């Protein structure tokens, strides 16, 4: 991780040795502007749910945040946020978040964050490194929303960079290296970039249940969606059994992207583990 003193640090290690096989945190550390709410269980599957709170109110220029999540063999966790992550003006340099994730054998992590709102003259760099056992299930969704501007301008932020690496923890094999870079001022208009849309999203899913038939099914659902434009692509790599998909989505409303991502997460948890749909009970 970074050598700069972080504004907020959070570490969670989760195993499956709680009462009646429930997953639980065996290591929990927080410092500075990051906290977690007391864990709760959304159903009787034993999956533990943690909610992250950023108590500073928003990310500022030069801020660095660090997160580390370890899900041990057979454990199941859902990690979410209490509210949107807000990136304000960053004249001192980019706001940065580093996240390291390790998901063990037959373990599950659903990382379903609220939207990231980038305001005028904001630069945000996010680096996420994920190591997965081939039998693990990993779901991550993100939404990027342009913040309010007094002139009504939609894309007033300077830069958003979301860098994601996924590797096979048993072989070290790289499965995904994704670098989503949004620089509105480098584009003349929206044609060929976001077209008429203002909000963007991405969802990454890795799991043994992913195949090309599932990807085709999700693409059909996306094509029929009246308010979201996007595509789903299959992920695999030689030298590893890991496989998954990445979905890129565009819309004009944050809620449409969040609802779509939660629909996909609910569809997969029902098929793969017989769990109820996602219900984060935030509002």
From Swiss-Prot:
Annotated GO MF terms: nickel cation binding
GO CC annotations, alphabetized: cytoplasm
Region listing for Disordered, in residue ranges: 1-21
Cellular location(s): Cytoplasm
Entries under Pfam families matching the protein: UreD (PF01774)
Ranges that cross the membrane: none
Disruption phenotype: Cells are urease negative and are no longer able to transport urea.
Induction: By urea and nitrogen starvation.
Main location: cytoplasm
Keywords (A to Z) from UniProt: Chaperone, Cytoplasm, Nickel insertion
HAMAP family hit by this protein: UreD
Similarity comment: Belongs to the UreD family.
Subunit structure: UreD, UreF and UreG form a complex that acts as a GTP-hydrolysis-dependent molecular chaperone, activating the urease apoprotein by helping to assemble the nickel containing metallocenter of UreC. The UreE protein probably delivers the nickel.
Classification via PANTHER family: UREASE ACCESSORY PROTEIN D (PTHR33643:SF1)
Role, per record: Probably acts in the maturation of urease via the functional incorporation of the urease nickel metallocenter. Required for urease expression.
The protein's name: Urease accessory protein UreD
Natural source organism: Corynebacterium glutamicum (strain ATCC 13032 / DSM 20300 / JCM 1318 / BCRC 11384 / CCUG 27702 / LMG 3730 / NBRC 12168 / NCIMB 10025 / NRRL B-2784 / 534)
